[in-house]
Amino acid sequence: MSGPSPTYVTFDTSVGSFTVELYTAHAPKTCNNFAKLAERGYYNGVIFHRIIPNFMIQGGDPTGTGRGGTSIYGDRFADEIHPELRFVGAGILAMANSGPNTNGSQFFITCAPTPYLDGKHTIFGRVSSGMKTIQRLEAVRTDKDDRPVEEIKIHRARLGDATQGGGLAVAMPA
């Protein structure tokens, strides 16, 4: 996944759009998984099933339970922990997991520094535009299980350029 331009994925959600830049040099397998899932429409119609203010928003599970989702490599794949990447602030994109080497399709975006997650989750990108949308997501009302009271959906996830609404196709290896 080398090339002159970074890879971006734009999410159109119930509360607005945001774009993430993928760290293909640091987590190539994870970025390929995420981009391919987006390209295939896997995330379209999926909800953000867990939102915790001052911590993170989580989505990517087509069952909406927090227990589902698979990768393009099969059920699960290995972590790509990179020592240079740390949970230093809001807007960091990482894989949700249930322990080491259990990555599938679920991801989360931080809403604050979370250094206690360093070395436990693969960081593979950052929000490059649309942090206001992330803040709107963070502010939705949730129940006792951190699930939004009203469903917040990903209407569409697409590969593109860095601009909001960009539709420039980016080639991804198989």
Swiss-Prot record:
Pfam families: Pro_isomerase. It comes from the Eukaryota. GO terms for cellular component: catalytic step 2 spliceosome; post-mRNA release spliceosomal complex; Prp19 complex. GO terms for biological process: mRNA cis splicing, via spliceosome; mRNA splicing, via spliceosome; protein folding. Its EC number is 5.2.1.8. It catalyses: [protein]-peptidylproline (omega=180) = [protein]-peptidylproline (omega=0). It is an enzyme of class 5 (isomerase). Residues 5-159 form the PPIase cyclophilin-type domain. The keyword Isomerase applies. GO terms for molecular function: peptidyl-prolyl cis-trans isomerase activity. Keywords: Isomerase, Rotamase. PPIases accelerate the folding of proteins. It catalyzes the cis-trans isomerization of proline imidic peptide bonds in oligopeptides. Belongs to the cyclophilin-type PPIase family. PPIL1 subfamily. This is Peptidyl-prolyl cis-trans isomerase-like 1. The gene is CYP1.
